[in-house]
Design a protein with these regions (language model features):
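Intrinsically disordered, low-complexity segments enriched in polar/charged residues with Gly/Pro
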Residues: 8, 23, 58-64, 79-80, ...
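Catalytic strand-loop segment that frames the active site of acyl-thioester-processing enzymes
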Residues: 1-39, 56, 127-128
């Protein structure tokens, strides 16, 4: 599990120029629809890169690249202070252009919540 703190959200806001109050203004957000600030959906999605190597082991490669994503959904917001983790399922593996393409469905779970924060099919390519 990893905690999403306000400094991470603020850093993402700076990096992406998305300073919407639901993300960066704890005082205003306290009376908003979520009762606190929330992580950007794309911040949650970006953390898939942290979770993926924890979920699948890829050996004997010289390089791995992100090829894309399919079916990205954000069913539930991640409130600042919440803890999240990734769960993965390999959907497919196929040979492509001298390497392998692997599709993994990642579900970003929120501790003590029924609905996930994000569900995405990540597409990675690995080369020997």
């Amino acid at each position: 599990w990893m905690e999403i703190d306000q400094s991470r959200v603020d850093g993402f806001a700076e990096a992406t120029d998305d300073h919407q109050w639901i993300h960066v203004d704890p005082e205003k957000a306290a009376s908003g629809p979520f009762g606190t600030t929330i992580a950007h959906g794309y911040l949650t999605l970006s953390l898939v890169n942290k979770f993926l190597p924890q979920l699948i082991a890829v050996t004997e490669i010289s390089m791995g690249v992100n090829y894309g994503c399919d079916r990205v959904r954000f069913p539930s917001p991640v409130k600042v202070g919440a803890r999240i983790r990734g769960r993965g399922e390999v959907i497919s593996v196929e040979e492509v252009n001298g390497g392998q393409q692997v599709v993994v469905r990642i579900t970003v779970e929120i501790e003590n919540e029924n609905r996930p924060a994000c569900v995405v099919d990540t597409i990675s390519r690995f080369y020997p």
